[in-house]
């Protein structure tokens, strides 16, 4: 896109890649892209890498999938800043995204956002995660959803009242039911 838009300064088209935690740390293509990111012909002016870190790769625990504590550690090979945020706190995710964009635009370098979260359901419709990760999924099932946590925050700080919030949920559910 940068080529076709004649974006020679690499400022108008911002590459963004979304990765799973296991894929980011385990697929060689990520390391290859980092290794080539500073080379003429491969430089994008910095890519924003977003890791959806659900702390499990299909059914594999992180300690069996990589040698480092965080999947984002791979970004250290190019000194990319790594921003960790809580997936249950949408405002922290937005804050990290703003920092990432500002950094990328100013320094033309890659940046990594590691959204630490969880997968409430299995890897796919045929996966029952409590078979392979019983302790983790016992905790996840008792943990409130991000929507519930953030909704309560907005209600408690007076951003929205409960009836308006419930109306938004109802309207959203109705739109989903209609296929919108």
Describe each model-derived feature in a short phrase:
Residues 170-180:
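Single conserved hydrophobic/aromatic residue that forms the stacking wall/gate
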Residues 1-169:
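Glycine-rich ThDP/TPP pyrophosphate-binding loop and its adjacent helix/strand module
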């Amino acid at each position: 896109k940068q080529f076709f838009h004649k974006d020679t300064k690499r400022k108008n088209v911002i590459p963004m890649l979304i990765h799973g935690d296991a894929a980011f740390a385990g697929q060689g293509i990520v390391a290859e892209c980092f290794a080539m990111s500073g080379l003429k012909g491969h430089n994008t002016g910095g890519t924003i890498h977003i890791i959806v870190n659900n702390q499990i790769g299909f059914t594999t625990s992180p300690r069996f999938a990589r040698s480092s504590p965080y999947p984002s550690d791979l970004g250290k090979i190019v000194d990319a800043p790594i921003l960790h945020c809580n997936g249950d706190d949408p405002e922290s995710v937005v804050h990290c995204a703003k920092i990432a964009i500002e950094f990328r635009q100013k320094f033309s370098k890659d940046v990594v956002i590691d959204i630490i979260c969880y997968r409430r359901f299995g890897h796919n419709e045929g996966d029952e995660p409590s078979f392979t990760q019983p302790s983790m999924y016992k905790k996840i099932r008792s943990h409130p959803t991000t929507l519930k946590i953030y909704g309560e925050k907005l209600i408690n700080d007076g951003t929205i009242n409960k009836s308006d919030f419930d109306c938004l949920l109802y309207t959203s559910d109705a739109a989903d039911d209609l296929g919108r």
